[in-house]
Amino acid sequence: MENVSFSLDRTLWVFLLAMLGSTAGQPLGGESVCTARPLARYSITFTGKWSQTAFPKQYPLFRPPAQWSSLLGAAHSSDYSMWRKNEYVSNGLRDFAERGEAWALMKEIEAAGEKLQSVHAVFSAPAVPSGTGQTSAELEVHPRHSLVSFVVRIVPSPDWFVGIDSLDLCEGGRWKEQVVLDLYPHDAGTDSGFTFSSPNFATIPQDTVTEITASSPSHPANSFYYPRLKSLPPIAKVTFVRLRQSPRAFAPPSLDLASRGNEIVDSLSVPETPLDCEVSLWSSWGLCGGPCGKLGAKSRTRYVRVQPANNGTPCPELEEEAECAPDNCV
């Protein structure tokens, strides 16, 4: 069974937090500097919306069932990039996207904090053991390190993940109070598997990060291929809420109550993605049967490859007959 959660070594995390917290120097780039208050704390809540109703095709039910890896993120300046669409992923992110292994990615974050002084803090949240559910953490941002990036692996999958690339929580002279974003699947470009449970098949040469859509990759075998949809429903969402109190005295703010209410609405309004029936090609015609001198009948069959769901196109007839001249008549 695939290892769906990774163990983050406590000693390394303590070292990382201490090291990165002491390297809040000026960023090397020429980006505009945030003039908000020196520090801000946020709660981050990741909500999985990967349900069988919204994503019925090849939905993983066992070995392992649909779920999410731990969340791994960083608060940083523009000199650091955890991942970026249309660019190649690092070795660390490759390991995370393919196997959920975080060690190499954590070492890359550490190196960026030491050499470039571009990472202010790291944060993580526990894995979600089902396709739908929540996990949360807290993070700290700094005016010179106001960008946030994170990744969560889709489990099971070849190298698919969701995440945010360089979200700026600062807007001019103030910190944003709340940010809610829908998340969609991305392909890390390191494994060529088409389905959730595809065996390991390295992409050589490596490709860049691409967003997976209802029509791309344009192949019926792909687990996210829904040709009737213009776009996929969000597979997850993330909510950032600025915290007004110290972490020890933190109580869920009123915004959290609103978000819980939204979760109830979301659960009642889960999009029903139609899944059309798919059948095989016709078999060869069988032998023609019947008395000599009269018309006989022959038949051929096909079988269901994908059962329809959520009001998708029903399956056509699976057997067909035709008239014929009987075989072996002299």
Swiss-Prot record:
Pfam families hit by this protein: Spond_N (PF06468), TSP1_spondin (PF19028)
Main location: secreted
Spondin domain boundaries: 30-220
Function: Cell adhesion protein that promotes adhesion and outgrowth of hippocampal embryonic neurons. Binds directly to bacteria and their components and functions as an opsonin for macrophage phagocytosis of bacteria. Essential in the initiation of the innate immune response and represents a unique pattern-recognition molecule in the ECM for microbial pathogens.
Sequence positions that bind Ca(2+): D159, D187, D191
InterPro entries for the chain: Spondin/Thrombospondin_T1, Spondin_N, Spondin_N_sf, TSP1_rpt, TSP1_rpt_sf, TSP1_spondin_dom
A GO term from the CC aspect: extracellular space
Keywords per UniProt: Calcium, Cell adhesion, Disulfide bond, Extracellular matrix, Glycoprotein, Immunity, Innate immunity, Metal-binding, Secreted, Signal
Glycosylation, residue list: W282
Tissues where this protein is expressed: Abundantly expressed in the developing hippocampus.
Disulfide bonds: C34-C170
MF terms (GO), sorted A to Z: antigen binding; lipopolysaccharide binding; metal ion binding; signaling receptor binding
Subcellular location: Secreted, Extracellular space, Extracellular matrix
One biological process term in Gene Ontology: vascular associated smooth muscle cell proliferation
Gene3D superfamilies named in the record: F-spondin domain (2.60.40.2130), Thrombospondin type-1 (TSP1) repeat (2.20.100.10)
Region forming the signal peptide: 1-25
Oligomer and partners: Monomer. Interacts with integrin.
Protein name: Spondin-2
Positions of a divalent metal cation binding: E140
Domain TSP type-1, residue spans: 276-330
Keyword Manganese assigned: no
PANTHER family xrefs: SPONDIN, SPONDIN-2
Marked site: Important for metal ion-dependent interaction with integrin: E140
